[in-house]
Amino acid sequence: MKNFGQGFTLIELLVVIAIIGILAAVALPLYKGYTVMAKLSEVENAMSTVASGVTAFYQDENSWPDCPTVIEVGSSLGVSLGAVLRISQISVSGVDGMITVSVQNIDSMVDGKTLTLSPTPIADGSLIWDWGWSADFPPQFRPKSGR
């Protein structure tokens, strides 16, 4: 009987390397998408905080706050956004209460794009909020309620 050497052949190693390459090619884009969505959730949470302040202002004053800068958003609405690094600009329109945010430091696919949160008053004095976005905002990264 012949004694065969122990170990893997070159073909077997190449097959394993090819399989690992295919798995990496599938996994990396998925991972990137999940990290973008996680970073965008910070922006969505900040916008929801501002929406709570706008709701309270509207219910107290029966008008919309006019806050064109992040400083005025914080002082006029009494909300603290903390250090939200993903927002380059946030404002609240005094005309219709729309919250507008420009995102940054997330990914080239969404940086510079705009998200909006628009209120609709209902009879009992509360507000219904609807998400919006700029036309070039990638569909896979839009807020869940707006997909």
Q: Which residues are covered by each model-predicted region?
A:
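N-terminal single-pass transmembrane signal-anchor helix
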Residues: M1-V36, E42, A46, V50
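Conserved hydrophobic/amphipathic alpha-helical signal-anchor segments
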Residues: G33-V73
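Periplasmic/extracellular, small/polar-rich flexible segments of pilin-like filament-forming proteins
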Residues: Q59-R147
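A general marker of short, structured functional hotspots
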Residues: F4, A27-L30, G53-V54, G125-L127, ...
